């Protein structure tokens, strides 16, 4: 059975405050764990929208589970080996801009968004001379980021405090 918000008791959806480029294991096990902890312990009250464009089905797999997944935590706590499972519920949605460019651009209009994170490697931070601002979407990570940031700048009418 898939996890989803109908069969697992989790927090209500919070406003999206973080746009995350990528859905790899590191981001899901580190960045989202920190956001989850900030929600539970420090009143962050924010969720994540994932921009996932490498795998054609990655976003839909995340959305099938309403953004929920189980994180396995292993380590030493107070000198004792521990192994814990935690359901991460801070992902609201995943969007593939190659399949739904308008939904990708709509992230720029979300009033609560304050952060963009990515762990894009040097292989993904490249210049492509054929990328155009009018491409829907551009092909490279930097160009997609520029499209999103320009959308945000336009949405907030240049207000740097938003």
Describe the predicted segments one by one.
Residues 1-162:
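Non-transmembrane, aqueous-exposed alpha-helical and coiled segments at domain scale
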């Amino acid at each position: 059975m898939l996890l989803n918000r109908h069969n697992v008791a989790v927090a209500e959806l919070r406003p999206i405050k973080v746009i995350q480029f990528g859905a790899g294991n590191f981001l899901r096990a580190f960045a989202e764990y920190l956001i989850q902890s900030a929600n539970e312990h420090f009143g962050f009250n924010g969720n994540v929208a994932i921009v996932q464009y490498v795998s054609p089905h990655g976003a839909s797999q995340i959305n099938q589970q309403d953004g929920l997944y189980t994180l396995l935590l292993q380590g030493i706590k107070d000198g004792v080996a521990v192994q814990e499972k935690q359901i991460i519920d801070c992902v609201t949605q995943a969007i593939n801009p190659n399949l739904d460019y308008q939904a990708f651009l709509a992230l720029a209009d979300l009033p609560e968004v304050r952060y963009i994170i990515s762990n894009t490697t040097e292989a993904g931070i490249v210049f492509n001379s054929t990328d155009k601002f009018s491409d829907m979407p551009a092909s490279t990570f930097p160009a997609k980021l520029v499209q999103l940031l320009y959308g945000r700048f336009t949405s907030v009418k240049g207000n740097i405090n938003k």
